[in-house]
From Swiss-Prot:
GO terms for cellular component: cytoplasm; extracellular region. It comes from Dictyostelium discoideum. Residues 1-13 form the signal peptide. The keyword ATP-binding does not apply. The keyword Secreted applies. Residues 73-103 are annotated as: Disordered. Its main location: secreted. This is Putative uncharacterized protein DDB_G0282937. Glycans are attached at N67. InterPro entries: Mitofissin. Keywords: Glycoprotein, Secreted, Signal.
Amino acid sequence: MLLSSIVSFVADAAVVSTSIACLRHFTGFSLLRPANKIKNDKIRTGLLVYLNSGELIFNKGLEMVRNSSIKSLSSDSNRNIIDNSNNNQHPSSSSTSTSWKKF
């Protein structure tokens, strides 16, 4: 029971930190300047680690989305080339010969 509460708290904290990183990424609003004004070194260091962990999670997630979209686009374009080559066959041609349309 205690372990599930801790895991839930850590997951919620990661979501909040990642949301703050997303806000900074898309709007430019950053909490790093106000965080640097905190006088207590331990609290400031903890807050900076917390904010930087959200940045790390957001950047890794964004990188994964970009890589998967690039792979998806490249596989879709290859599929379109194959589909177009099959559609460009002349109706009277045999299955062994391919007639290409001129553009």
